[in-house]
A protein has these predicted regions:
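Anionic-ligand anchoring segments at beta-strand to alpha-helix junctions in alpha/beta enzyme folds, i.e.
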Residues: 1-32, 132-178, 223
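Internal, active-site/partner-interface "lid" segment
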Residues: 65-66, 72, 102-132, 231-249
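Phosphate-moiety recognition in structured ligand-binding domains
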Residues: 196-249
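Short amphipathic alpha-helix initiation/capping segments at coil-to-helix junctions
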Residues: 176, 186, 190, 210-214
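Glycine-rich phosphate-binding loops that contact phosphosugars or nucleotide phosphates
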Residues: 1-120, 139, 182-207
């Protein structure tokens, strides 16, 4: 989510923007402000990262659970509890945060929502059950959301999924796909890669130019696959809703 917003904010000329997971926030950056994204507001790495920021630096928390530990260490908090969800895997919270922040910088969120709604009735293609490897590609915002899509497939399906910038894919990773692979391009840029992908025997889905709407389409596809495979999408193995280290309980 943060990668997508940072990319779009810079492309819109709103200023240099960084994106880091809580565990990788560097020291010494001269930021004017920070936005901390957390559905639960309890993950140790995020809370610790905010605590370590310079005193007086404005920090806005976008949090799905009010009254959380993160809410106690940020300067101000935007309550997104309406977008919270019981599932371990984030879908609604993610698309809500993306819509909010991308919309601030000019993204046509209403158009994306309309396109996304049209995807909700799509059925799985007949060949979906044959796919063993999922690859997501995009540029700019699409590249960031390709990583988000790949993460969702790993979490929901415990399957091999990857995300790459479209132009980088030909530099090596394309060699690992074949007839049991699906390559999903989230935007409409770089059509020249399509034939190279098809030549490997892989299936190809090409987005319609709106990576935010396409992310919802990908969620719908994943929902169909978990039904097909008999998986509980709300409780995937080995992961929890929040990662709280023992010393912070």
């Amino acid at each position: 989510m943060a990668q997508a917003v940072a990319s779009y904010r810079e492309r819109q000329g709103a200023g240099e923007t960084d994106a880091f997971p809580g565990s990788e926030v560097p020291e010494g950056r001269a930021w004017a402000s920070v936005i901390a994204l957390s559905r639960s507001g309890t993950t140790t790495e995020m809370v610790d990262a905010v605590r370590a920021l310079p005193e007086g630096l404005p920090v806005l928390g976008l949090i799905g659970e009010p009254g959380s530990p993160l809410g106690q260490v940020v300067s101000s908090e935007l309550d997104l509890s309406f977008a919270d969800e019981q599932s371990v895997v984030q879908t609604r919270f993610a698309t809500t945060v993306l819509s909010l922040l991308l919309g601030i910088y000019g993204w046509d969120v209403e158009a994306s929502a309309s396109r996304a709604e049209g995807f909700l009735t799509e059925s799985l293609p007949d060949w979906a059950g044959e796919i063993k490897q999922f690859v997501f590609l995009g540029r700019g915002v699409g590249a960031a959301l390709a990583n988000e899509a790949a993460l969702k497939f790993r979490e929901l399906l415990a399957t091999w999924s990857e995300g790459y910038p479209t132009m980088e894919y030909r530099h090596g990773p394309i060699s690992a796909i074949g007839e049991h692979s699906l390559v999903w391009i989230l935007d409409s840029e770089e059509p020249s890669i399509d034939e190279q992908i098809r030549a490997t025997g892989a299936r190809l889905i090409r987005g319609e130019g709106d990576p935010l709407a396409e992310l919802v389409r990908i969620h719908r596809f994943a929902e169909g696959l978990v039904d097909l495979r008999g998986i509980n999408p709300d409780q995937p193995p080995h992961i929890t809703r929040s990662v709280v280290l023992a010393g912070d309980r």
